[in-house]
A protein has these predicted regions:
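N-terminal secretory signal peptides and thylakoid transit peptides that target proteins
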Residues: 4-26
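N-terminal pre-ligand scaffold of iron-sulfur
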Residues: 20, 33-132, 171-204
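Disulfide-bonded cysteine motifs in exported proteins
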Residues: 114, 134-136, 154-155
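His-Asp-centered metal-binding catalytic motifs of divalent-metal-dependent phosphohydrolases/nucleases
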Residues: 121, 142-143
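Short linker/helix segments within small regulatory modules
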Residues: 130-134, 163-164
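Cysteine-rich micro-motifs
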Residues: 136-142
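Short Fe-S-cluster ligation motifs
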Residues: 146-190
Length: 204
């Protein structure tokens, strides 16, 4: 009778199985940059043809003349007529007017940012904290922190992830002659506005 190797006890992985696992992981990581993640991750929509209002929770449109410096509001985008759809995390964005030291007192579009609120680590919802000594985005689940100027994670588990999964998806904004703020049609790709829950390559 042929000698049989002893069973693998205690859930330990043999050296051979470990090497096989590492080889498989390496193969997967090789192709990650070439995957069209927009087809797999739940983004709000494939295309948005026209600009949309930055609509606040009270139904008013954000305006450069009235929105306070160093403050933020959650905004739904793209908004639908279905209240259930509008509750989806992947439609929730943090609209921020930067603090004074980051240019928030300017009455132009450079004073504003709009990032997906879906944390890039495990998809909890982060928020902006305007308190002295903070003035950053913080995820309550595992402590990832985001720079309000760029959307890049600078602390916590999201900051340890490789690009583009360390920078939040961002919407481009514009201001009309009345000071009302609008969202430009996005390009849902890592090299464009990013992919919600996956990230964005940071433009230099």
């Amino acid at each position: 009778m042929a000698h049989q190797p002893p069973p693998n006890r205690g859930g330990k992985v043999s050296r051979r199985d470990f090497l096989k696992l590492m080889a498989a992981a390496g193969t997967v990581l090789t192709f990650v940059p070439f995957v069209d993640w927009g087809k797999f991750l739940p983004n709000p929509t494939a295309k948005v043809a026209s600009r949309a209002k930055v609509e606040l929770a009270d139904g008013t449109q954000a305006n450069v003349k009235t929105f306070p410096v160093n403050s933020s509001k959650a905004v739904i985008y793209p908004k639908t007529d279905d209240p259930t759809l509008n509750k989806e995390s992947f439609r929730t964005w943090q609209f921020i007017r930067l603090p004074e030291e980051l240019g928030g007192t300017k009455n132009d579009i450079s004073a504003f940012r709009m990032y997906s609120m879906v944390c890039l680590h495990l998809w909890c919802l982060w928020k902006y904290w305007p308190d002295p000594g903070r003035k950053r985005g913080e995820c309550p689940c595992h402590g990832s922190m985001y720079d309000p100027l760029t959307g890049k994670a600078f602390a916590g588990p999201a900051s340890l992830q490789a690009p583009p999964s360390n920078v939040l998806a961002r919407l481009d904004l514009e201001i009309d002659s009345s000071g009302n703020i609008w969202i430009k049609p996005p390009n849902w790709s890592p090299n464009g506005n990013g992919i919600v829950g996956y990230g964005r390559f940071l433009r230099e």
